[in-house]
Design a protein with these regions (language model features):
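Acidic/His- and Gly-rich active-site-bordering loop/insert found
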Residues: 2-102
Length: 102
């Protein structure tokens, strides 16, 4: 990130504070318990919420046999994009599955 990119990114993040809080409140409403690890619906719900925030979202479903081989019923990876300038790319890795309640 270049010094000229920082103000644009900061302005974006500050301006999105309420949307971020609403996003997180909505996100935790979508079940993603693992087991059973059926996270495709959660990923789609997440993608829709992120698109509403102005991000470009690519959906990459993992083949069912590969998901099952890793103990998951379904997995969809999301790639998000938001351009702030000509600076370097910022990458973040996260997961949406959670342990069952209780």
């Amino acid at each position: 990130m270049t010094p000229t990119d920082r103000p644009a990114m900061r302005a974006f993040l500050v301006g999105m504070h309420d949307a971020e809080a609403n996003f997180l409140a909505e996100l935790v409403r979508a079940p993603s318990d693992n087991p059973p690890g059926d996270c495709a619906a959660h990923a789609e719900h997440t993608a829709i919420l992120l698109e509403r925030m102005g991000l470009t979202v690519e959906r990459h479903p993992v083949p069912a046999e590969l998901a099952r081989a890793h103990g998951m019923a379904s997995v969809t990876n999301l790639v998000l994009r938001r351009r702030f300038g000509d600076g370097p790319v910022f990458a973040m890795k996260a997961h949406g599955d959670v342990v069952p309640p209780g």
